[in-house]
Amino acid sequence: MGSTGKIKIGINGFGRIGRLVARVALTRDDIELVGVNDPFISTDYMSYMFKYDSVHGKWKHHEVNVKDSKTLLFGEKSVAVFGCRNPEEIPWGEVGAEYVVESTGVFTDKEKASAHLKAGAKKVVISAPSKDAPMFVVGVNEHQYKSDVNIVSNASCTTNCLAPLAKVINDKFGIVEGLMTTVHSITATQKTVDGPSNKDWRGGRGAGFNIIPSSTGAAKAVGKVLPALNGKLTGMAFRVPTPDVSVVDLTVRLEKSATYDEIKAAIKAESEGNLKGILGYTEDAVVSTDFIGDSRSSIFDAQAGIALSDNFVKLVSWYDNEWGYSSRVVDLIVHMAATQ
C-alpha cells in the first residue's frame, strides 16, 4: 500500500489488455497507477492510444496529456512512462509499483516474470495463462491464494468465462464430462489479410472475412482452478470477425438429473449471491454487442441454452473478452493485497 492507502500498480505492455487495465484502474478508488512500460510506444502515442478506442469509445473521465517524454497526466495524476525492453531494468522500485501487470504476452512463465521482482516490484500478475505460475480465477479459486506467492496468472478470458459457470453446474449437479466451444472475437495476433503464421496455418488467414477454427487451452485450464474437473473438460475455438465480445458454448453430461429450468434457477441464484458481479444471468434476447463494456466474467444466456435430456445439456454464456478480463486482473490484485 502506498501512503495514500491505495494499491500501487505498474503495467508492462500497453496493448489491448494493458490499456484497458489502465482504464479500469483509473476509475477505481482503491488502485493507483504509478507506471507504464512499453519499449515500442512513445509517450505521446501512448496518450493517443489510451484516449481513443475503436471498441470501448473515447476516454471520458479526465483529460489525458503528455507532461514530458517520461510522464503522462491523467487529470492531475502523473504516471511514469518507461521504454525498457528488459523487465529487470524497469524502475518499479523507484516509482513504488508494488503490483505489476505483465501484459506483453511475452514474459508468461515464472522465470521471465520474476524479472519484475528484481526490478523492485513485490508481486506480478500475468494477464495470460502460464505454464508454471499458479492460475487464479476470481470467483472460483482466488481464496486459495497465499500471501507468500509472488507471481500469479489471471488465466485467460475464456477460462474466466467458463470456470464460474462450470463451478456452479459441478457444485449443484456434478459434471461427468463436457466439451466447450468458444466463438471468439478477433485478437491482436491475427492477420488483416492472409499472412504467414508458421505455428498455426489457419490463424494466418484474414481475420475480417473468415470463421477460423483454433485451439484453446481454456477448458483444460478449468481443471487447474477446479481440480474436481481435471480431465473432464476440453474444447476448441472459432475465431470470428467481431472486434470484441465472445461466447462460450458448454455441453455437459450431468451426474444428477436436472431439468433446464432447475439449471437456470441454480445459475440465477449464484449470479445474485456468491458470484454477483462475476457471473451474470439474462433472459433477454441479447446479441454480442449488448455486452461491450460488461465488467462481468460470464453472463449466462438462459434463452440460448438447450437440454436434450435431464442429463445432457448445452449452456451458453457471453463475455467481453477485453473489458471483463481486464476488470478481473484488477480484482485479483485487490484480493492479493487484502491477504498481505
Swiss-Prot record:
Cellular component annotations (GO), alphabetically ordered: cytosol
Top-level taxon in the UniProt lineage: Eukaryota
Q: Which CDD domains match?
A: GAPDH_I_C, GAPDH_I_N
Among the record's GO biological process terms, what is one? glycolytic process
Q: Which residues bind NAD(+)?
A: 16-17, 38, 85, 321
Question: Which residues take part in binding D-glyceraldehyde 3-phosphate?
Answer: 156-158, 187, 216-217, 239
Q: Where is this site: Activates thiol group during catalysis?
A: 184
Key words of the record: Cytoplasm, Glycolysis, NAD, Oxidoreductase
User: Where, by residue number, is the active site?
Assistant: 157
**Catalyzed chemical reaction(s):** D-glyceraldehyde 3-phosphate + phosphate + NAD(+) = (2R)-3-phospho-glyceroyl phosphate + NADH + H(+)
E.C. no? 1.2.1.12
Question: Which principal EC class is assigned to this enzyme?
Answer: oxidoreductase
Biochemical pathway: Carbohydrate degradation; glycolysis; pyruvate from D-glyceraldehyde 3-phosphate: step 1/5
One Pfam family in the UniProt entry? Gp_dh_N
User: Where does the record say this protein resides?
Assistant: Cytoplasm
Entry GO MF terms: glyceraldehyde-3-phosphate dehydrogenase (NAD+) (phosphorylating) activity; NAD binding; NADP binding
State the family named in the UniProt similarity comment for this chain.
Answer: Belongs to the glyceraldehyde-3-phosphate dehydrogenase family.
**Quaternary structure per UniProt?**
Homotetramer.
The extra comment attached to this record reads: Plants contain two types of GAPDH: cytosolic forms which participate in glycolysis and chloroplast forms which participate in photosynthesis. All the forms are encoded by distinct genes.
What is this protein for, i.e. what is its function?
Answer: Key enzyme in glycolysis that catalyzes the first step of the pathway by converting D-glyceraldehyde 3-phosphate (G3P) into 3-phospho-D-glyceroyl phosphate. Essential for the maintenance of cellular ATP levels and carbohydrate metabolism.
What is the designated name of this protein? Answer: Glyceraldehyde-3-phosphate dehydrogenase, cytosolic
Q: Which organism is it from?
A: Pinus sylvestris
